[in-house]
Amino acid sequence: DQDEGVSTEPTQVGPAELHNDETCVGPLVYRN
């Protein structure tokens, strides 16, 4: 949510989705 540098990596879904979806393989992996 606060990491803009990480949310700028749209892998499968949009940045907004990645913040809420933990199943997505992308920025979420970095934060969790």
Curated annotation (Swiss-Prot):
Glycosylation sites: 11
Compartments, as annotated in UniProt: Secreted
Region described as Disordered: spans on this chain: 1-32
Domain Fibronectin type-II: 19-32
Biological process per Gene Ontology, one example term: single fertilization
Keywords for the protein's UniProt record, in alphabetical order: Disulfide bond, Fertilization, Glycoprotein, Secreted
GO CC terms: extracellular region
Record note on quaternary structure: Homodimer.
Family: Belongs to the seminal plasma protein family.
Summary of the function given for this chain in its UniProt record: Could enhance the fertilizing capacity of bull spermatozoa upon interaction with heparin-like glycosaminoglycans present in the female genital tract. Exhibits both simulatory and inhibitory actions on the release of pituitary gonadotropins. Binds to heparin and gelatin.
UniProt name for this protein: Seminal plasma protein PDC-109
